[in-house]
């Protein structure tokens, strides 16, 4: 087990309070300011609880949130500011309450209040919660818009949406005219969409002011962030600190570096489990679904053989692609005599609040994207968290009472962590970003006002990729979109998948390609519990295609549709029914976009070669060939890669494949593979492969 930190941790860490050495612009405490908050206007009255016990409970919960007593102060300040940065820890109530306070204060009279979220699940669940609190049907006063789903109406005044969806709206209206206020929530996550949105919203606010239009209020919210950077970027915006209910947290570090963080986490969990009262729950941070499912199984197996007197253990995994009904279990109390052990990805860092957590076990690892513009490879890699992420994880232990965090790394190791997480825009493929900016008619993408500028190499690599996909042309020393590029931008997809759909009519397989792209656009439709691996493999045999994962997924979807989306069938075949229904919705919307473009929609009628040819013509930059020693290397850069164990091709050795993504753990794995002929690739991009071949020879 880790040893205790040398300094009293409670003194070192109080999320929500002002970090040492930083200038405080304003301090809003949850212990005061319940009246008018010093503002000249009267604070608008809150709705009174209704007779319904559920409504009454909601209203009581709302009034008990840390933010409630600062309501008057907050509203008085926000009314008079064009820009504000608000810091308040997870669970303070800022995300659900600030939009309501602004609405109750009349901010929405001249336009909608938008609240952006990095995650689809958060946008939907928050909109549902706020509509309940406002006693209105979801989609009326309060609604949400996420990719492929719009639950709003003409009456909507508070709108939760993913940052990517607000970006898509900016393509058709760069001034965001329908909004009076944009709240950029979870800003610290710095996703690729969030960073682009910062620049788009800032530009819209400036242009509206220059044109004498309705002012746009911008509020940036987070549990933690580099406030100086955000304040400077948004025109020296005042920073409002909102204190919450954080309790003291003891922090323990390991004495020695851990070679196997998974084993260290397992040992820590069972040591806590055998010593702590059953009512105190444990939250463990791991990096991804496979690790989480494997550890969940191991914990359950070990828990069955513990001595008498030990509490029972309820092990609950938590990750984005887990079926929604199973995600909800982490918020429910454990049965009497049971301890909840939640094993989660970084989704539990800030996006959600889980009650009952006394102990946090932090492995200090996370799975994040990395991009190499020279090789053109974008991989998911397991790496160290930043100090900011480590503090966020620690803070999960102090929500309701004092807590304990076990950091499975030494204090010296922690001191070497990066202070902040590198923004995604500086470590990702930027092809989607450049396509969107050009669709918004940004005059020069190289000089766009990014908060953290990507390297010129990354931008140039993205431009080169879009060029290869036929999306760009150079006119009067300016980059513009070709007709194909404009069509690609109309799809809410990565450029390569948009191009796949556009090419499908040439290969007479649009129906099949629409299904495959839709399947790749949602979280995994397959559920693979490690404890039932043999059973999973047995029932899936009937769907497997030797032509690859894409065709296998296509077979599963077709059967799902043929049996009418039967839930029992989904359960028997380990298919996530909710995600499969979402695939059907996504497909319908993509098909509608095709029809608007007057694209002929044809089926290959069982001819899978035409489907694979189409994939080869759009994914030619993601190809690998079998080497003489039986290994694989990417066709263009000769990077060694391997077929992922989850692929239906894992035990096969096709000569040439295209893949959808790369995952780096102990080696670089290809995921979602399709068998292709090398000839098709040279047919798709002869100049590209000639150039690569010449470089390789030199």
From Swiss-Prot:
Provenance organism: Mus musculus (Mouse)
Similarity section: Belongs to the DEAD box helicase family. DEAH subfamily.
InterPro entries hit by this protein: DEAD-box_helicase_OB_fold, DEAD/DEAH_box_helicase_dom, DNA/RNA_helicase_DEAH_CS, HA2_WH, Helicase-assoc_dom, Helicase_ATP-bd, Helicase_C-like, P-loop_NTPase
Keywords in alphabetical order: ATP-binding, Cytoplasm, Helicase, Hydrolase, Inflammasome, Nucleotide-binding, Nucleus, RNA-binding, Ubl conjugation
Known EC number: 3.6.4.13
PANTHER family: ATP-DEPENDENT RNA HELICASE (PTHR18934), ATP-DEPENDENT RNA HELICASE DHX33 (PTHR18934:SF118)
Uppermost EC category: hydrolase
Region entry HA2, spans: 462-553
MF GO annotations: ATP binding; ATP hydrolysis activity; DNA-binding transcription factor binding; double-stranded RNA binding; mRNA binding; rDNA binding; ribosomal large subunit binding; RNA helicase activity
Protein name: ATP-dependent RNA helicase DHX33
Location within or outside the cell: Nucleus, Nucleolus; Nucleus, Nucleoplasm; Cytoplasm; Nucleus
Annotated GO biological process: positive regulation of MAPK cascade; positive regulation of NF-kappaB transcription factor activity; positive regulation of NLRP3 inflammasome complex assembly; positive regulation of transcription by RNA polymerase I; positive regulation of type I interferon production; translational initiation
Binding site for ATP: 88-95
UniProt cross-references to Gene3D superfamilies, sorted A to Z: 1.20.120.1080, P-loop containing nucleotide triphosphate hydrolases (3.40.50.300)
Biased segments, Gly residues type: 30-40
Disordered: annotated segments: 1-20, 29-50
Function recorded in the entry: Implicated in nucleolar organization, ribosome biogenesis, protein synthesis and cytoplasmic dsRNA sensing. Stimulates RNA polymerase I transcription of the 47S precursor rRNA. Associates with ribosomal DNA (rDNA) loci where it is involved in POLR1A recruitment. In the cytoplasm, promotes elongation-competent 80S ribosome assembly at the late stage of mRNA translation initiation. Senses cytosolic dsRNA mediating NLRP3 inflammasome formation in macrophages and type I interferon production in myeloid dendritic cells. Required for NLRP3 activation induced by viral dsRNA and bacterial RNA.
All residue ranges annotated as the Helicase C-terminal domain in the record: 271-441
One CC-aspect GO term: nucleus
PTM characteristics: Ubiquitinated, leading to its degradation by the proteasome. Deubiquitinated by USP36.
